[in-house]
Amino acid sequence: RDDGSSDSTWDLLIAYKERYPMVFDALEGENVGFAMSFTRLLQRAVERYNDADYFAFCDQDDVWMPDKLKAAVDRLKGEDHSIPLVYCSNTTLVDVNLRVIREAWDPRRVALTKERALIQSFATGCTMVFNRVAAETYVTHLPEVIKVHDFLMYQLCMFLGKVVWDEKSYILYRQHGNNQIGKKDFMGRMRKRMEGHYKEHVLELQNRRFLAAYKDLLSEEAVWLISRFV
């Protein structure tokens, strides 16, 4: 999706669409920010590809391993597809020349709990693959404001379905000054989300919006838990 650019981005997207019509689509629009751009693309994908079983978020500057999507689908196949499911994985941090820096997450520190999901996500959007139930639930229960699309998908699946986390990395996560969040390394970007973009009062607002959007789908226990964080 072209987010209201003023350069030749749209012409480039159209060229790709004409060259690869079976695998490439393009959506033009006004500037709404990265979170709503991803959201509008997902709305379009859910409507247009009504036979798709899985969907994935993708950033333009990362490098996927050949088996990235297969690994995700293999992990999700055996799960209960009547509930929202999201697969996410570790990421390999690399510099602009694709030299490995380190793995982003220490698996021993990953806590997949509902309580932790109200203050932190262990799912990087570019690793996410989710089922149709998750995608349809996301696009039909949008909060009034979405700050970070992948955090919302993470919370949705944590409270209404299941998060499948893979400690193995299938993606090279490029670190440079042009990354959308704007930090040089992954942990710096996550700290910015938590300490800057997601200060305590902003997290409370995020959780309040999540509760308002999904209250009719949440259990009484989940409503009680989220209410403690708003």
Identify the meaning behind each predicted range.
Residues 139-140, 145-146, 152, 172-230:
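C-terminal subregions of glycosyltransferases and related glycan-biosynthesis enzymes
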